[in-house]
């Protein structure tokens, strides 16, 4: 009897995961994140030099960060621009040096372009969350300006704190001798989780639960770390771009990596936004009384209910197609509340 109960619980668990994945798949198709990622990649490349220039200017305003500017640059390029990071760093530093010599009007233009990137990110994420209410111009500009000014300071402060912790004699004992290398090795992953968590909780113009955002942040961070290693392996082992483009290979390599990065960011956002929708559906239906086909055990002959559309929100349908017929022959629907 106990084994049957455990088997039923496992069955319900996998059914829930399956339905969530179908719901997520439907969302990904509706939101066309591949097109959004391409748009954000283009805007990112256009805004890359202005963002770096503004960031370095903000760090230069604080004397405490002058000694670690090189460390911050190395950390960012090594962990966020795999493979071609050294070449990109040389070019970007040269471009930033040229941009910093501009006039006040030129610097203001750089700030405007940097704000364009943040605005594009804001609109893309709020579209994923189906947010109706838009921020006022004053609130939006204040938030964008806060990101530009406080973002570099927070990154610099976190690296300073990390350097201080690493230098503490507390970690020099034999018992903890193996802890610090492991901590330093996992540091990029921790930073990625924190960055994605902050992005998914702050940017949407609605309340996002911490655990939902954490799930999306962890998935995105893990995919980001795997993506870095896989992309670096591809570039080094299969140098097709270098064979075709020669000295200009850095440009398409950078664009492809930025595009993949935004795909991962948007996927994490979709997971975070889909969680409350699926949980609301689960709480409104007796999922424990369904079999693996998605039909109620007591009334399997009853036709599946048609989804209802709520004003201002897209209808979420988890419907098995011909591709999924072997696994789930009956259609499964999910009504978004």
Swiss-Prot record:
Keywords: Cell inner membrane, Cell membrane, Membrane, Transmembrane, Transmembrane helix. The keyword Glycosyltransferase does not apply. The chain crosses the membrane at residues 4-24, 45-65, 102-122, 137-157, 183-203, 213-233, 247-267. Residues 291-337 are annotated as: Disordered. Belongs to the UPF0761 family. Pfam families: Virul_fac_BrkB. Its main location: membrane. The lineage of its organism: Bacteria, Pseudomonadati, Pseudomonadota, Gammaproteobacteria, Alteromonadales. It is found in: Cell inner membrane. This is UPF0761 membrane protein Shewmr4_0316. Disulfide bonds: none annotated. Residues 307-319, 328-337 have a biased composition (Polar residues). GO terms for cellular component: plasma membrane. InterPro entries: UPF0761_bac (IPR023679), Virul_fac_BrkB (IPR017039). The keyword Membrane applies. It is a multi-pass membrane protein.
């Amino acid at each position: 009897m106990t084994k049957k109960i455990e088997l039923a619980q496992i069955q319900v668990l996998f059914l829930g995961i399956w339905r969530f994945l179908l719901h997520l798949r439907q969302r990904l198709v509706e939101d066309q994140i591949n097109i959004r990622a391409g748009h954000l990649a283009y805007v990112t490349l256009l805004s890359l030099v202005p963002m770096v220039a503004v960031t370095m200017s903000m760090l230069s305003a604080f004397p405490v960060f002058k000694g670690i500017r090189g460390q911050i640059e190395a950390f960012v390029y090594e962990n966020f621009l795999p493979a071609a990071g050294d070449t990109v760093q040389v070019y970007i530093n040269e471009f930033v040096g040229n941009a910093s010599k501009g006039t006040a009007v030129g610097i203001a233009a750089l700030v405007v372009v940097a704000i364009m990137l943040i605005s594009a990110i804001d609109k893309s994420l709020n579209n994923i969350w189906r947010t109706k209410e838009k921020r006022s111009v004053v609130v939006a500009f204040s938030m964008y300006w806060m990101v530009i000014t406080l973002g570099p300071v927070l990154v610099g402060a976190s690296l300073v704190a990390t350097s201080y912790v690493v230098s503490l004699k507390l970690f020099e004992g034999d018992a903890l001798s193996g802890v610090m290398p492991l901590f330093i090795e996992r540091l990029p992953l921790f930073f990625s989780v924190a960055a994605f968590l902050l992005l998914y909780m702050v940017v949407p113009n609605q309340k996002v639960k911490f655990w939902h955002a954490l799930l999306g942040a962890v998935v995105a961070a893990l995919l980001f770390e795997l993506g870095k290693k896989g992309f670096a392996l591809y570039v080094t082992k299969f140098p097709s771009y270098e064979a075709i483009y020669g000295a200009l290979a850095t440009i398409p390599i950078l664009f492809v990596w930025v595009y993949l990065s935004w795909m991962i960011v948007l996927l994490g956002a979709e997971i975070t936004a889909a969680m409350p929708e699926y949980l609301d559906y689960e709480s409104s239906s007796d999922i424990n009384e369904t079999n693996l086909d998605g039909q109620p055990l007591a009334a399997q002959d009853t036709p599946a209910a048609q989804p209802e559309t709520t004003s201002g929100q897209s209808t979420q349908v988890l419907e098995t197609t011909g591709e999924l017929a072997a696994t789930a022959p009956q259609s499964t629907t999910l009504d978004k509340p």
